[in-house]
């Protein structure tokens, strides 16, 4: 288990972020309620922007920031993943003009948060994701991870972009 803080209070996750070289396979739900698997992204680098909810300020900022950066990334998909219902994700993207990243939900696939080690097991956000970044190579293997130490802080966007 890993530990971060939520408003300065220590909280724990179900596990650790995957080690470099680990193959990540997943199925998630798109905004139209269809399913998509990691196989759909093979051949591309994939940034997994994992966060608690689109309805929090920092999470919304991370989506906007990655959306702006994604327009200049070659052969790279940016997936913004939370437990939000796809309807909430679609509403946010529509209102914000988000077009360069995909928002995906694991509300039907709780195994995603187990595989990535990101589910909070205690605290006020219990059941939601810890703010983290996982970069996958074209074969779906982990090449970079970041577990943000304080949930209310943004991830290091430049660090993951540099790893591309």
Where are these regions (language model features)?
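Chalcogenol-based redox active-site neighborhoods
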Residues: 1-164
